[in-house]
């Protein structure tokens, strides 16, 4: 993980905090974008895909193992994002943040800029059919030794 300069991050987080919310959602989205664009995060996802992609087959029926692998994938993503948020935002707590994030998304405010990019990516990762297609694509790359 790339480590943020703790002093400047803490000052920015405190300066932008909305009084009605525990966290400044706009700043949180910036931190999530930094995580999502982090080469180490991208590498971790690629390693996961290469490790598990051979389990996936192009067929309508889904094996039970697919659900297990998808859950592990989501845990990996959540671990990275929560780790980055904890580094960047003093006192960050995911259980406090998630209801605020949901409220922000439901308000329609997440339809702009980085917020939209982050929400779209999170939704695509959580969507099982998209995940399965991604794993099938990774399997083809591994099979043909393209990567």
Give the residues covered by each predicted segment.
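Low-complexity, disordered terminal segments
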Residues: 1-2
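Phospho-regulated, Ser/Thr/Pro-rich intrinsically disordered or coiled-coil terminal scaffolds
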Residues: 5-83, 88-96, 102-105
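Alpha-helical bundle protein-protein interaction modules that mediate dimerization/oligomerization
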Residues: 81-84, 88-147
């Amino acid at each position: 993980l790339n480590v943020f300069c703790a002093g400047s991050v803490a000052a920015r987080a405190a300066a932008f905090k909305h009084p009605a919310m525990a966290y400044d959602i706009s700043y949180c989205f910036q931190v999530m974008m930094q995580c999502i664009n982090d080469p180490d995060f991208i590498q971790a996802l690629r390693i996961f895909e290469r490790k598990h992609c051979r389990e996936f087959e192009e067929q309508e029926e889904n094996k039970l193992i697919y659900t297990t692998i998808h859950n592990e994938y989501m845990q990996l993503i959540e671990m990275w994002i929560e780790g980055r948020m904890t580094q960047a935002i003093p006192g960050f707590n995911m259980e406090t943040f998630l209801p605020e994030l949901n409220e922000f998304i439901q308000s329609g405010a997440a339809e702009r800029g980085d917020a939209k990019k982050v929400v779209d990516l999170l939704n695509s990762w959580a969507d099982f059919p998209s995940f399965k297609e991604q794993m099938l694509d990774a399997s083809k790359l591994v099979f043909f030794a393209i990567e």
